[in-house]
């Protein structure tokens, strides 16, 4: 698996309210970006680093309850940031009279259960989540997006069936070509 899966698994075993770290929701207060749709996790990553350094790292990482509580707190804050920014983007579309019929939430982050739950609470937007099996590999996500675009258009039929797309072997380390040994 990847980091997102490990984070979610740990967070599901933890309780954010038990975490001693007070992690900030990025770009929320007193920032020139607080009213934009920008995403930034740099401040959150720095806060995580400092919070972990407040503990003896050997003790911290051997205490699974502490790690799980910390993971739950981090996930909660990261998801809140994503939801805040998504809400701002939806508000901007409405304010600018931009037509938006649906919002597709895709990529690896779309596999996060908490993010799916929290985004589903947003009103006035039709959310589309690809099947979880397609939320791990960007290449497959691109294929799925193309399939959906063709499926919903009045022009040519899909190039691939959903079964053909979902039967693709997914590997996070697939090579792009032959390495020639030169940089």
Model-flagged regions — what are they?
Residues 1-183:
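Acidic, glycine-enriched active-site microenvironments
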């Amino acid at each position: 698996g990847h980091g997102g899966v490990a984070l979610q698994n740990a967070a599901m075993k933890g309780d954010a309210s038990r975490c001693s770290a007070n992690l900030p929701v990025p770009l929320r207060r007193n920032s020139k970006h607080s009213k934009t749709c920008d995403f930034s996790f740099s401040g959150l990553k720095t806060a995580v680093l400092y919070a972990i350094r407040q503990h003896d790292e050997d003790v911290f990482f051997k205490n699974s309850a502490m790690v799980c509580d910390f993971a739950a707190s981090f996930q909660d804050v990261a998801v809140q940031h994503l939801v805040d920014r998504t809400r701002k983007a939806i508000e901007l579309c409405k304010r600018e009279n931009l037509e938006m019929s649906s919002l597709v939430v895709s990529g690896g982050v779309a596999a996060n259960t908490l993010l799916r739950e929290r985004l589903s609470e947003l009103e006035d937007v039709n959310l589309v989540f690809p099947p979880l099996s397609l939320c791990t590999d960007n290449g497959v996500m691109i294929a799925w997006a193309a399939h959906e675009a063709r499926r919903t258009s009045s022009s040519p039929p899909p190039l691939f069936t959903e079964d053909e797309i979902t039967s693709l072997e997914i590997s996070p380390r697939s090579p792009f070509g032959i390495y020639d040994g030169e940089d």
